[in-house]
Amino acid sequence: MSNRQVTPRTEGWTQKKDESGKPLLQFAEPKRGKPPQHLVDIDPADRAETIKGLGIPGFRAKQLATHYFTHYTSDPADMTDLPKEGREELAQKALPTLLTEVKRLKTDDGKTIKFLWRLFDGALVESVLMRYSNRITLCISSQAGCGMNCPFCATGQAGLTRNMSAGEIVDQIVRANKVIAEGGLGKARHDDERVNNIVFMGMGEPLANYNKLMSAIRTMVEPQPNGLGMSARNITVSTVGLVPGIKKLADEDLPLTFALSLHAPDDKLRDDLIPVNDKWKVDEALSAAYEYYEKTGRRVSIEYALIKDMNDHVWRAELLAEKLNDFGKGWVHVNPIPLNPTPGSVWTASTPEQTDAFIDTLESLGIPTTLRDTRGKEIDGACGPVSYTHLRAHETRHD
């Protein structure tokens, strides 16, 4: 097995630095105009009053919510239960257009779709829709751009443009459900198919947009017709390690799935790989992750992109297992993520032999481990902070 050590570096772009020479982190969004207020942005209990404030009878709020959350439409032509006169104005006021589709790319026999959306101010975000044998998953964005400045991440190159609103976050799901309902995601298995699994692994750091993130999630789990009626257990929030946000998430009354994008068990490497590690070290992030498990009873996922000769050494697998086992058994699961082979780049796939050795080491030390397969290579179907990796087609237990 190789003991060579490759150092993280940017390729084709220059990482922004602060006055001390460290990678620049952006937690506060730049001042920009706000997207139009949408029904999603209003608490269900307040919608009737808000609608009345627009000069519209309050009972119309439930009708509008039914169209949007159940029929996945904001097109006034579909709302035949509303008076024809004023219907268009009503829809525009309560359900303004938040996402404009720029591009749609398909692969995997139509079972994977990557969407590029333009927001009201021209900012661009992506989401990836994937059909599996037992579920339909949507990988969604929470910010336009990202302020975490990771050297491997295409999203972080331009920095943070702005936070997305709760309406913009949820609208990715509604728009995806509309595509599914229209037969746009391969062969349907039944008439009422919809997205039933959400992963916050698209553009942005979810916990850096905490309030809008939680507002969106509460709309997702709110029963129809006031929300999407999804299961909190089928919503995964992934973070690069914003410890205060992890602790806040643990105190929410929702059994969400939590994933920590770790990618290195030692601070020396992770400081360069994940710049926010300079604020919250590996041990702090793992301690917060364990606290999440203790408070919620929900097993934590550790995301670990295997990068050739950078973080795939057996000794790092041993160190990772040691750190995880220090908290006990049964609380965590590791997901090594294979990269695409990229000749000439430092960000390239580990060899099969090194991948096997890394996983065998973790499993021999009692750490449950699942290697992720890839999905969407042909369309660069990257999903999340690790923008060069691809969300799995199946979770296959390593043999």
Where are these regions (language model features)?
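Conserved AdoMet/S-adenosylmethionine-binding subsite of the radical SAM
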Residues: 181-188, 194-361, 365
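Conserved beta-strand edge residues that scaffold enzyme active sites
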Residues: 65, 376-377
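Residue-level detector of anion-binding/catalytic polar loops
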Residues: 368
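Conserved small/polar residues in nucleotide/adenosyl-binding loops
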Residues: 389-398
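A structural preference for short, hydrophobic beta-strand core positions in alpha/beta folds
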Residues: 336, 371-373
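Flexible, acidic/Gly-rich N-terminal and inter-domain linker regions that tether
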Residues: 2-136
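Canonical Radical SAM [4Fe-4S] cluster-binding loop centered on the CxxxCxxC motif
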Residues: 131-182
